[in-house]
Amino acid sequence: MRVLKYMLLYILYLKSIVKILRRLNNMAGSNIIIGIDLGTTNSCVAVMENGKSKILETPEGKRTIPSVVAFKDNEIIVGDVAKRQMVTNKNTISSIKRLMGTDKTVEVNGKKYTPEQISAQILSYIKKCAEEKLGQTITKAVITVPAYFNDAERNATKNAGKIAGLEVERIINEPTAAALAYGMDKSKTEHKVLVYDLGGGTFDVSILEIADGTFEVLSTSGDNHLGGDDWDQKIINWIVEEVKKNDKVDLSNDKMAMQRLKDAAEKAKIDLSGLKEVEISLPFIAMTESGPLNVDLKLTRAKFEDLTRDLLERTIKPVEDALKEAKLSASDIHKVLLVGGSTRMPAVEELVKSKLGKSPDKNINPDEVVAAGAAIQGGVLMGDVKDILLLDVTPLTLSIETMGGVSTPLIKRNSTIPISKSQIFSTAADNQPAVDVHVLQGERQMAADNKSLGRFILDGIEPAPRGVPQIEITFNIDANGILNVKAVDKKTNKEATITIKDSSGLSQEEIDKMIKEAEENKEKDAQLKEQQEIRYKAESLINMFKTSLNGEEGKKVDAKQKEEAEKMINEFETLLKEEKWDELKTKINQFEAMASQFAQAAKQNEEKKEEDKKDSEESKN
């Protein structure tokens, strides 16, 4: 008896310890830094667990999340569900990453949204998925961007994170993240790695040297307007031309038809990575004078590669530029990593092999490796991953405009960051009272040919002949690749500073307002999500039951069972139409039970028929 008493006390003690550990774990949850690959087509999230990066699945068990946002009935839907309704819902937005850092907006139901706001919806969904998987509140993230993203695009990404309720601890380049994931357990051996990163909307090449735990980016190059979407577009254009030629119909002005073509083109591209030929079948794509139009075409891999040869060739120069900047030849590269879903195309692998003389490493998942690397960087920032030092670079030259519209560089492209550089300038006219500091990004000699990042004025300069005042301009790039500029009059010590903001012009007040709106709508969004899930489940059950009733199972049950099933379906359809969510929620279990009973009855009736038939045959014999 005494032993039993002590055992019970010990069990209670263990339970209390578990509770304390859970509480401490939840308290520590805010210190977790997740790694996010915010992609053009798909996104992915990872976290460090037991010294290794782990991809976090969505509640549906998916390891990647389509970067698609849909607006429907005052509800915002993200991911797979949003992608599934792209054909029928015109208020569905994809590839928003291509607009990051611009002043462009997308309009939905008369309201304009910035690229940051749409990206924030994707990040918010990713954050929620991670929280559900880890059972903890997540507030910190490392987010990846294409290596060739400029300052405005990086700031826009950081702002999107803020709106989503994430403290963006670090912005790192996608190829660098991929190399981190690849080389985490190989960092002791010195070797050079070329990362060929072809995503949905961007293309990057980076060369890194890995040695003694240090990952040093030697060079980077790329094209921010080249990606898998462009390969899809080539197929779309081909289908449109084939239909014009064969059926004398132009589909290019039919939005719904074009969306169906987009889906079909993406599928054909993916399928052609494993097949030599695919069939593109699109029934009832449009209505013509002679009736519905069906598209039935065959596309071979050879034809596809011919259609997209110019796109593939556009990836060659960035590879050559990266090698030139790093002062390396192809033979100096030890490993080639292919990153991004678009690198699964056989033509990409063949091109890389022919240009670099070696086969790419196949031990990484091109869709997941970037998120895994971001999680490792998060681990470094948390102090959980030690003995790793990441030395990244700035992708483009940073300069100011000087007399005659000349672009004068302060920090050259592929300089290791963080970095700070200063230079003395002077006035261009006698008694000039102020200087206009125009900050530029790009490789061109003239200011007008480069991207303007921003400008500010340093005034209060004392009267003096031209060339006498000394104005010190300092450029400082932090570890996120974000630029701060300072101008100081050396005589008076008067200074002016600017942190380059993204060209979409979102102020801190606007960002704060968006964060507040997201927080205020949290409960409402959760309710709408639950309703959407109930609707989806109810519709699935109704469709499944109807299929059973009208199919073979329906023939195997008696009239009374069939009548009860039809009654339940009608009741469910009415509740769904009237949006009686609570009643639907409580009755879903009843409906599932009836569906199970229906299937069981059909099975039993079929078995009874078989037995009766067997008995009848035996009695005849």
Swiss-Prot record:
<comment type="function">
    <text>Acts as a chaperone.</text>
</comment>
<dbReference type="GO" id="GO:0005524">
    <property type="term" value="F:ATP binding"/>
</dbReference>
<keyword id="KW-0067">ATP-binding</keyword>
<keyword id="KW-0597">Phosphoprotein</keyword>
<dbReference type="InterPro" id="IPR013126">
    <property type="entry name" value="Hsp_70_fam"/>
</dbReference>
<dbReference type="InterPro" id="IPR012725">
    <property type="entry name" value="Chaperone_DnaK"/>
</dbReference>
<protein>
    <recommendedName>
        <fullName>Chaperone protein DnaK</fullName>
    </recommendedName>
</protein>
<dbReference type="InterPro" id="IPR043129">
    <property type="entry name" value="ATPase_NBD"/>
</dbReference>
<keyword id="KW-0547">Nucleotide-binding</keyword>
<dbReference type="InterPro" id="IPR029047">
    <property type="entry name" value="HSP70_peptide-bd_sf"/>
</dbReference>
<dbReference type="InterPro" id="IPR018181">
    <property type="entry name" value="Heat_shock_70_CS"/>
</dbReference>
<feature type="compositionally biased region" description="Basic and acidic residues">
    <location>
        <begin position="604"/>
        <end position="621"/>
    </location>
</feature>
<comment type="similarity">
    <text>Belongs to the heat shock protein 70 family.</text>
</comment>
<dbReference type="GO" id="GO:0051082">
    <property type="term" value="F:unfolded protein binding"/>
</dbReference>
<keyword id="KW-0143">Chaperone</keyword>
<dbReference type="GO" id="GO:0140662">
    <property type="term" value="F:ATP-dependent protein folding chaperone"/>
</dbReference>
<feature type="region of interest" description="Disordered">
    <location>
        <begin position="596"/>
        <end position="621"/>
    </location>
</feature>
<dbReference type="Pfam" id="PF00012">
    <property type="entry name" value="HSP70"/>
</dbReference>
<keyword id="KW-0346">Stress response</keyword>
<feature type="modified residue" description="Phosphothreonine; by autocatalysis">
    <location>
        <position position="202"/>
    </location>
</feature>
